[in-house]
Amino acid sequence: MVKKVALAYSGGLDTSVCIPILKEKYGYDEVITISVDVGQPEEEIRKADAKAQKISNKHYTIDAKEEFVRDYIFPLIKANGNYEGYVMGTSVARPLIAKKVVEAAKKEGAIALAHGCTGKGNDQLRFEAVFRQTDMDVIAPMREMNLTREWEINYAKEHGIPVEATKSKPWSVDENIWSRSIEGGRLEDPSFVPPEEIFEWTKSAEDAPNEPRIVDIDFEAGVPVAIDGEKLGGYALVKKMNEIAGENGVGRTDMIEDRVLGLKARENYEHPAATVLLAAHADLEKLVLTRGELKFKKIVEEQWSEMAYAGLVDDPLFADLNAFIDKSQERVTGTVKVKLYKGALTILARSSPNALYSEDLVSFDSQTIDQKDAEGFAKYHGFQARMYRKVVGK
């Protein structure tokens, strides 16, 4: 029987060297590669396809862009998904990619699933949370062989595999429609200032336009549906916002991130659309949700983000959290006006047919509320603190 293994394939260094390794070191007869398009550059998809056609036994390229935005990004927006300041583009993409790999593996009759993740990062966990729901073997050559990037570069050259990474410029890039991450090489030194050349989606504040860009974003039930009055599909909307915000220098993050395993990592991200859409959505929520809803939702959001970051999207608790979030978003409909200027984002205004804000009630000139009625409340505000002072004698 022909032994087949299905490999999650990006076209990068790690997954490219996995192909000969799976044959030479693990004894598989055929390596089936699967690339999943979640918004990578078209050229990257084309190169991955061309490379895989030469070095793998069979290759799939699966278009999952709309599915990614609809089923992963929009729920993230509704949840105000954020892990330590990271918008989790890579985090939420991995489970979808893994599921597509499993589907292809079953179609091909593969007996094993493989990925090119290292033993130090989070992606191994995200892939395997999905892979291990099957009865197939799971293989992680990078982790199991304890490979270094330098070894991989040399191995690739020995096997005639073209790679873009070099020893002098070894950083790696992971990109989808929601975010672009740049890591590795000198970037791992937190004291090293990243060169401007690593950024592709965003202009520096110095190079951004000298005039601010004002944008209106329409939401329906927590989901962005239009930019400046133009209705757009999910993928098209995120793509357009990436272009608008990136042009104005909005959406860069340089951070120290706590990985699931406990390691701290220096990460550089570009996420223009995510920065704007998340800020606008959170602002609109403040207009339409009650104080109690907002307070409790923050607890839910933190748990949701922790689980999404770890790739635990198939956990029953994650479904429970989404059920609450979806219910909370039924009234989150309206428009938010933002200003983008030289790397800064400013919320200018917001409106909603479901607004709980009443200009008449809060106005200094309004007589709708009798101010004297607040006296009884004021008398007992801070009551326990006053009792404490009496008891301790201070």
UniProtKB/Swiss-Prot annotation:
<comment type="similarity">
    <text>Belongs to the argininosuccinate synthase family. Type 1 subfamily.</text>
</comment>
<keyword id="KW-0067">ATP-binding</keyword>
<feature type="binding site">
    <location>
        <position position="122"/>
    </location>
    <ligand>
        <name>L-aspartate</name>
    </ligand>
</feature>
<feature type="binding site">
    <location>
        <position position="118"/>
    </location>
    <ligand>
        <name>L-aspartate</name>
    </ligand>
</feature>
<feature type="binding site">
    <location>
        <position position="86"/>
    </location>
    <ligand>
        <name>L-citrulline</name>
    </ligand>
</feature>
<dbReference type="Pfam" id="PF00764">
    <property type="entry name" value="Arginosuc_synth"/>
</dbReference>
<feature type="binding site">
    <location>
        <position position="257"/>
    </location>
    <ligand>
        <name>L-citrulline</name>
    </ligand>
</feature>
<feature type="binding site">
    <location>
        <position position="116"/>
    </location>
    <ligand>
        <name>ATP</name>
    </ligand>
</feature>
<dbReference type="InterPro" id="IPR048268">
    <property type="entry name" value="Arginosuc_syn_C"/>
</dbReference>
<feature type="binding site">
    <location>
        <position position="91"/>
    </location>
    <ligand>
        <name>L-citrulline</name>
    </ligand>
</feature>
<dbReference type="GO" id="GO:0005524">
    <property type="term" value="F:ATP binding"/>
</dbReference>
<feature type="binding site">
    <location>
        <begin position="8"/>
        <end position="16"/>
    </location>
    <ligand>
        <name>ATP</name>
    </ligand>
</feature>
<dbReference type="GO" id="GO:0000050">
    <property type="term" value="P:urea cycle"/>
</dbReference>
<dbReference type="InterPro" id="IPR023434">
    <property type="entry name" value="Arginosuc_synth_type_1_subfam"/>
</dbReference>
<feature type="binding site">
    <location>
        <position position="269"/>
    </location>
    <ligand>
        <name>L-citrulline</name>
    </ligand>
</feature>
<dbReference type="InterPro" id="IPR014729">
    <property type="entry name" value="Rossmann-like_a/b/a_fold"/>
</dbReference>
<keyword id="KW-0028">Amino-acid biosynthesis</keyword>
<keyword id="KW-0436">Ligase</keyword>
<keyword id="KW-0547">Nucleotide-binding</keyword>
<feature type="binding site">
    <location>
        <position position="181"/>
    </location>
    <ligand>
        <name>L-citrulline</name>
    </ligand>
</feature>
<comment type="pathway">
    <text>Amino-acid biosynthesis; L-arginine biosynthesis; L-arginine from L-ornithine and carbamoyl phosphate: step 2/3.</text>
</comment>
<dbReference type="InterPro" id="IPR001518">
    <property type="entry name" value="Arginosuc_synth"/>
</dbReference>
<dbReference type="GO" id="GO:0005737">
    <property type="term" value="C:cytoplasm"/>
</dbReference>
<feature type="binding site">
    <location>
        <position position="172"/>
    </location>
    <ligand>
        <name>L-citrulline</name>
    </ligand>
</feature>
<keyword id="KW-0055">Arginine biosynthesis</keyword>
<dbReference type="GO" id="GO:0000053">
    <property type="term" value="P:argininosuccinate metabolic process"/>
</dbReference>
<dbReference type="Pfam" id="PF20979">
    <property type="entry name" value="Arginosuc_syn_C"/>
</dbReference>
<protein>
    <recommendedName>
        <fullName>Argininosuccinate synthase</fullName>
        <ecNumber>6.3.4.5</ecNumber>
    </recommendedName>
</protein>
<feature type="binding site">
    <location>
        <position position="122"/>
    </location>
    <ligand>
        <name>L-citrulline</name>
    </ligand>
</feature>
<feature type="binding site">
    <location>
        <position position="123"/>
    </location>
    <ligand>
        <name>L-aspartate</name>
    </ligand>
</feature>
<dbReference type="InterPro" id="IPR048267">
    <property type="entry name" value="Arginosuc_syn_N"/>
</dbReference>
<feature type="binding site">
    <location>
        <position position="126"/>
    </location>
    <ligand>
        <name>L-citrulline</name>
    </ligand>
</feature>
<dbReference type="InterPro" id="IPR024074">
    <property type="entry name" value="AS_cat/multimer_dom_body"/>
</dbReference>
<dbReference type="GO" id="GO:0004055">
    <property type="term" value="F:argininosuccinate synthase activity"/>
</dbReference>
<keyword id="KW-0963">Cytoplasm</keyword>
<dbReference type="GO" id="GO:0006526">
    <property type="term" value="P:L-arginine biosynthetic process"/>
</dbReference>
<dbReference type="InterPro" id="IPR018223">
    <property type="entry name" value="Arginosuc_synth_CS"/>
</dbReference>
<comment type="subunit">
    <text>Homotetramer.</text>
</comment>
